[in-house]
Design a protein with these regions (language model features):
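Structural motif
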Residues: 80-81, 105-107, 132, 171, ...
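N-terminal lobe of the biotin/lipoate ligase/transferase fold
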Residues: 2-163
Length: 318
């Protein structure tokens, strides 16, 4: 009911009388007053004037589902959202939901994470209320061999959303990080549950530093606030990310991975650099010369031979 009241206030042009809300929402004016008190306690600034009614003045900087879904206008991504004040990891929660059959497009987000993680078990620093920490459940009818394409697609969608909202152009460090200059802005973690040649579901985790200060991040990281020199509305950023993911996900499902590749190649932080790819099968060092049609990175070794890596931890050497 709180969500309905907020939506009612957002759509109103000016003040809304308690009587009108009572009739439209089919509840007593006393119940409406009670909900208003609860919403104020959550951080909503609601003005009440005798004989005029209620008016929403400001919303809190919180990733509430009803805030994210208001005017989201997606068909799949974000139609169901689980929001938490704090979680160990949104990835773990989303994976459990995936196992339970939760619909594709479901989002798990948290204001903060106590055990946020990146690739290879690394810690993802998640200062509370300063970033977007979320995991998305996808159920694409694709073979497991195409999963690297999902990671790159999410990277492109995230970069496009950031550019649209801030005019910043992030570069993509293959396969899963976004950078501004030499500093990391966002990371992507993809985990899948598959049987033989069939993907049951994928969980895509996103960590984006939005309003974090330098003192709250590692020396190698940055945030949108640091780069733009101003605080940003996390809900608006999150909405743009979800819209962008839906757009690029549908492109991928329709066989247009070439558009993802083109974007990655044009905005790569890795290509033309000397790199080392760490892999259990053995490290590979050389120049990153391309991204293959299946999303793998092409490395030209000093011998002149070219090897493709589909996964691995990559280090930029120069």
């Amino acid at each position: 009911m709180q969500a309905k009241i907020i939506q009612f206030l957002k759509q109103a042009d000016g003040y809304v009388s308690g009587e009108e809300m009572s009739q439209q929402l089919n509840m007593s004016r006393a119940a409406i007053w009670k909900y208003m008190q609860e919403l104020r306690a959550q951080g909503y600034e609601i003005e009440a004037v005798p004989h005029l009614g209620y008016q929403l003045v400001a919303s809190p900087d919180k990733l509430f589902p009803h805030e994210i879904q208001f005017n989201l206008n997606t068909k799949l991504i974000g139609q169901k959202i689980f929001s938490f004040d704090s979680l160990g990891s949104t990835m773990d929660e989303a994976f459990l939901l995936g196992m339970e059959g939760t619909p594709e497009g479901t989002i798990v987000c948290a204001e903060g994470q106590t055990k946020g993680r990146g690739r290879l078990g690394r810690v993802w620093v998640s200062p509370k209320g300063k970033g977007i920490y979320c995991s998305l459940i996808l159920r694409p009818k694709l073979p497991p061999t195409q999963m690297p394409q999902i990671t790159l697609m999410i990277a492109v969608a995230l970069a496009e959303a950031i550019k649209h909202k801030t005019s910043l152009q992030p570069t993509i460090k293959w396969p899963n990080d976004l950078f501004i200059g030499s500093k990391k802005l966002a990371g992507i973690l993809t985990e899948l549950h598959a049987e033989v040649d069939q993907v049951k579901f994928i969980v895509v985790g996103i960590g984006l530093n939005v309003n974090a200060l330098s003192s709250q991040l590692l020396d190698t990281a940055t945030s949108l606030k640091i780069e733009t020199k101003g605080a940003l509305n996390r809900v608006e950023i999150f909405q743009e990310i979800l819209r962008s993911i839906e757009l690029w996900y549908y492109k991928l499902l329709k066989g247009h991975f070439d558009e993802v590749l083109e974007y990655c190649r044009e905005n790569s932080a890795t290509l033309k650099k000397r790199v080392r790819v760490h892999d259990p099968a053995g490290d590979v060092e050389g120049e990153a010369v391309g991204i293959d049609i299946d999303g793998g990175i092409l490395i030209r070794r000093d011998s002149g031979s070219i090897i493709k890596k589909m996964a691995g931890d990559i280090t930029h050497l120069r």
